[in-house]
Amino acid sequence: MDEFHRCGKEDSFWQQCFLYPLFFQEDLYAISHDHYLDVSSSSRPMEHLSSNDQLSFLTVKRLIGQIRQQNHSIVLFVNCDPNPLADRKKSFYSESVLEALTLVLEVPFSIWSKSSVEGMNECKSFRSIHSIFPFLEDKFPHSNSILDARIPYSIHPEILVRTFRRWIRDAPSLHPLRSVLYDYRNSPENLQRSIIVVPRVNTRFFLFLLNYYVCECESILFSRLKRSSHSRSLDHGSFPQRTHFHRKIKHIIIFSRRNSLKSIWSLKDPKIHYVRYGERPIIAIKGADLLVKKCRYYLLIFRQFYFHLWSEPYRVCSHQLSKNCSSSPGYFLRVRMNPLLVRTKTLDELFIPVLITNEMDPIVPIVPIIGLLATEKFCDISGRPISKLSWTSLTDDDILDRFDQIWRNLFHYYSGSFDRDGLYRIKYILLLSCAKTLACKHKSTIRVVRKELGPELFKKSFSKEREFDSLPFSSKAAARSQRERIWHSDIPQINPLANSWQKIQDLKIENLFDQ
C-alpha cells in the first residue's frame, strides 16, 4: 500500500483512472485475506479456522466478473462460498473482496484528504477528545446560542456511489462498491428501508464509508461557504479519522432553495465556531435569534440539496447558553458569570470596580451515570451498590483491575468539572460494589474481606486520581492545580458511559418533537 501511495503522489491521474486493475493484484488479496483471518480469529472459535479457509485467487477473479454482470437487485455472493460459516452473515470470499475493495478505495481517498488538509491555512486539528474542552472554554463564553447538529448517516446507495465519482474517474472500479452497498440494502434487516444505514460496527469498510461521508459533507459545506462569501479569511476542509476539529467562520452567506438559490441572505460578521466530536457537530453562534434560525435552516436545506435526504428537524437543535444547559460529550455545559473585584488605588481615593466574566461550567451528569451503572448491575436504580455477579468467576486481581479501569476512565473523563462531589459518589458506588463482589465470591461479608485483604484492597484500586493530581509541576503549579481544572488529553475516544448517556438525551429530544 505504501508503494501505491508513492505512485499516487507522483501521478494522481493514474490513481484515478486505473483503479480497476488493482482488483486483480494477488498481493492485495493476500493482505485482505490475512487481515480478515486476524479479525475473525478473535470472534470465532478455533475449530472454525480450518484449512478450508485458504483463499483461491481464481475464485476471487470469478467473483469480480460476476459483480460486473449481475443485477443489482439480487443479493450479492449468493451460493458462492463452498464452506459458509454459520455465525457469519457474509461469506468468506465476500469478506475478502470487501477488504480488498476498501484497500483500493483508501488509496485515492487518503491522497485527496491529505492534499485538502495540506492546502488549508491557519487551520488547527486535534486528535485527542479532550482538546475539545479547552476550545469550548475559550470560545463558548463569547457565544449566546449553540446548534447541536447530528450528521445524518442514512443515505441512498446510488447517491453515495455518485459522490465517489466526483474524485474517481475509473467507473468500473465503482461497480464492486455499488454491489456491496446494494447487497447490504437487500439484507433481511434492511428490506423495509429505502436508504442504507451505515452500521456502527468496527469494520474497516464501514469505518471508511463513515469517514468519507463525513469528509464529503464538511468539505462541500465549507467550500460552498467560502465560494459564497467571497472571503479569504474563511478556511475550509475535512479531517478524516479525527475525533473532532474546529473552525472559526467570520462571514457566511445562506442560500434559500425555495427561490432556486436566487435569494441570498447575507450574514454580516457573525461569530460562528464549529467543533465536532464523532458524528455530532456543535456550532456556537453569537448573534440574534434570527441568525440562529437562519443557520439552522441552512443546515437542513444543505443536506436536502446536496444529498437528497430529508433530515428530521430534531437533528438540528438550538439552545440558549445564557438560559439553558446544553449536552456536550457526556457533560452538561452552561456559561456562568464569574464576578471579579479589582481594586484601583490612586492618590485621592480607592476604586473597587466589579468585573463580570463568563466561563464555561461543565457539570457531571450524576443521575444518568448512576442509571447506566444500574443497567450494568453495579448498583440499583437508587444508587445503592450491589455485587457484580458475572465477575465472581474471575480472580481477585482481575476484579480489582476491572473496577480500577472503570473508575480511572470516569475520573479521567470528568476531572475537568469544578464540582467533583458527584464523582466521589460514583467512586463510593464502585468501591462498595467491588467489595461486595469479592465478598460474594468468597461467600463472606465486606468486613471479612477487608480484614483478610487488609488495607491493600483499597490502595490497589481507586488510587489513580492521586497520580493524576500529583503532576510533575512546581510547588506553585501543584497548588494551583488543586483549585483549577485539569483536562487530561490522553483518552483516545469518548467514554462508553458518556456515549450511552448521549443516546438517551437524543431519544428525549426525539420524543419532544414527536409530541
Curated annotation (Swiss-Prot):
It comes from the Eukaryota. It is found in: Plastid, Chloroplast. InterPro entries: Domain_X, Maturase_MatK, Maturase_MatK_N. Keywords: Chloroplast, mRNA processing, Plastid, RNA-binding, tRNA processing. Transmembrane segments: none annotated. The keyword Chloroplast applies. Coiled coil: none annotated. The keyword RNA-binding applies. One of its GO terms (cellular component) is chloroplast. One of its GO terms (biological process) is RNA splicing. One of its GO terms (molecular function) is RNA binding. Its main location: plastid. It holds the Pfam family Intron_maturas2. PANTHER family: MATURASE K. Belongs to the intron maturase 2 family. MatK subfamily. Usually encoded in the trnK tRNA gene intron. Probably assists in splicing its own and other chloroplast group II introns. This is Maturase K. It comes from Pinus densiflora.
